[in-house]
Design a protein with these regions (language model features):
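Conserved beta-loop-beta element that borders a ligand/cofactor-binding pocket
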Residues: 112, 132-155
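NAD(P)H-binding glycine-rich loop region in Rossmannoid oxidoreductase-like domains
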Residues: 49-86, 98, 114-117
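SDR active-site strand-loop-helix element
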Residues: 6, 30, 65-69, 107-113, ...
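Conserved glycine-rich Rossmann-like NAD(P)H-binding loop of the short-chain dehydrogenase/reductase
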Residues: 25-34
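Conserved active-site helix of classical SDR/Rossmann-fold NAD(P)-dependent CH-OH oxidoreductases
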Residues: 18, 92-93, 128-135
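Conserved Rossmann-fold NAD(P)-dependent oxidoreductase catalytic core, especially the SDR/UDP-sugar
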Residues: 86, 90-128, 145-146
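N-terminal Rossmann NAD(P)H-binding glycine-rich loop of SDR-like oxidoreductase domains
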Residues: 3-23
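Rossmann-fold cofactor-recognition segment
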Residues: 41-51
């Protein structure tokens, strides 16, 4: 399968990319910075999740899209609530729209265990809102999806 991983230069994305590559999938990584861990055979596209043209280039031709691009630091999200909305919600909606346009078979979203708690501040709010959008895209537009709720990931 052809797989695109947004946020693929990060801790989680880079490990998922490597595992998928080992299993024979064609992996395209899309991130705001070039991956330090890019493996042989993986394609790298550098761009911002909010740049629709670059995001579309990353998604076009993919069978599956893993959405790992996020403002994932809880403290940073508290200091930058607008960025948490732009990246975690708007970035996800832009990705969903392009997945529909290019007939992506499955959308996999990295969320957080905080969505059902009172912890996590704006990070929690943005991840919960993104999950709500994903569920509505499934109901209204039929996109197949998986939501993964991770705990804290230490590097």
């Amino acid at each position: 399968m052809k797989i695109t991983i947004t946020g693929g230069s990060g801790f989680l994305g880079s490990h998922v990319a490597d595992e998928l590559s080992k299993r024979g999938h064609k992996v395209k990584i899309f991130d705001k910075k070039r991956s330090k861990w890019l493996s042989s055979g993986q394609k790298m596209l550098v761009g911002n999740i909010l740049n629709s043209k670059k995001l579309e280039a990353a998604i076009k031709g993919a069978d599956v899209v893993f959405q790992f691009a996020a403002l994932a630091d809880i403290d940073q999200a508290l200091k930058q609530p607008i960025n948490s909305v732009n990246i975690n919600i708007l970035g996800t909606v832009k990705t969903l729209e392009l997945c529909l346009k290019h007939k992506v078979k499955r959308f996999v979203y990295a969320s957080t265990i905080y969505v059902n708690s009172s912890e996590g501040g704006f990070y929690r709010c943005s991840k919960k809102a993104a999950e709500d959008y994903i569920e509505e895209y499934n109901k209204i537009r039929g996109i197949d999806y998986t939501v993964l709720r991770y705990g804290s990931l230490d590097q």
